[in-house]
Amino acid sequence: MKNYVSNINLGNSSLKFIDERLQSENYRGIHLSQHNRYDLPKLIDILTLLNKHAPNQSLMQIRTTDISKRPQNIPEEQSYAEFCNEAKSLTNIGTQDAMRKNLFVDFARMGLINRYNDKKVLTDPFKRGVTKYVALSDMGVKLIDPKLDILSKNLIFSKSLNKLLTGFVEDVLSLLTNSDLKEISFDEFMLFVSAMNCNFNFSISTEQCESLIKEYRLLSRVQKNAVIDTLKSELIPDNFNGDKKDKRDYHNWANENQQIWTLFENIPFFIMEKDSRKLILITSDVDLSKYSKSKMKRSQQAKNDYFKHHKVNKIKGYELDHIIPLLEAESVDEYRYLDNWLNLLYIDGKTHAIKSQSGSKYYIFTFDDNDYNQIYFLDTQGDKLSINNDDTALFDKNKVPKIYEYNQNFINAKTS
């Protein structure tokens, strides 16, 4: 194994992890198209224009061939061409090719638009296929509602972004919620956080990520600078032989993470300190006087209440998990409802990873009527995760009916 940074401080586990990560051709971790340079305001502008050209969630026909192969639009694509021209003029992104091949792919995976094939059948946003029509989804309509306040828009964006990143936003929230880190730097985000619960061989749990970040913080300022400077000078494509998968590119890696990092600015659970390049979890001990997110303040009460009511102790390898993710909240009231001990469960790292990687689709709580030690997390299609007390979770079985009722109250509540 090639050592890039381990020699800067022999025995430091965080540096060893970085070198191990760089052995993988997937070292960059989570990937977003670098062409998709959008933020929440641009997203709202584009979806508003889509609503203008395809009102009332009607289907708009899009081009299915690259402009280089067929420069002209057919008559049925006129609305699409006009829409793309207006989007490009307003936001500086969204050519006809980029819109259908990049932006619409993201927006569909975020749940903000629906895509349809040539038979007008809804397609799976995470599977490849030819798309001929698009339309705003119910969530997309809600996001562009001019009567909706900005905080509620940010909450919807958070939920949508978590879907796009297959649970990554929730993982970051879990990392800062269940540890004493309180904040993370961009370098820590790129080197360690982006490896959480990914589908590559260097995947780490939130607990392992916390440990690596703390180990990294034991380095002196000079050593940390040496790590980044070394990676910048060593990870240059021309320094490597072979094809693309054999090469390493620091700037490409950093740019991809910067794109994801920037999107966190619109997530109301965090504060982005641009000057210091830090991402901070909003908690009761953060001074929010200079921010507009005071309604999203979190306290330790829900966590403390869980351990008090369930009479369990903290154990290595387990972490508190929101049964219904906080990212499901679409208003401050919903957020406060979900930030409660009755919406928490102390589960093991493996179960948390499965739940997170699924995009947190398992949020319906149920249990075995004959054995309260056996509970389940279901998704809307009936698939389930089996949870056993004193094994994959730690809880007081007598609290199970109350947790179930609390869960059902939210799930069955009518939404506007």
Swiss-Prot record:
| MF terms in GO | type II site-specific deoxyribonuclease activity
Keywords carried by this UniProt record? Endonuclease, Hydrolase, Magnesium, Nuclease, Restriction system
Q: What are its cofactors?
A: Mg(2+)
Keyword hit for Hydrolase: yes
Q: Where along the sequence do coiled-coil regions lie?
A: none
Could you tell me the EC number(s) of this protein? 3.1.21.4
Designated name of the protein: Type II restriction enzyme MboII
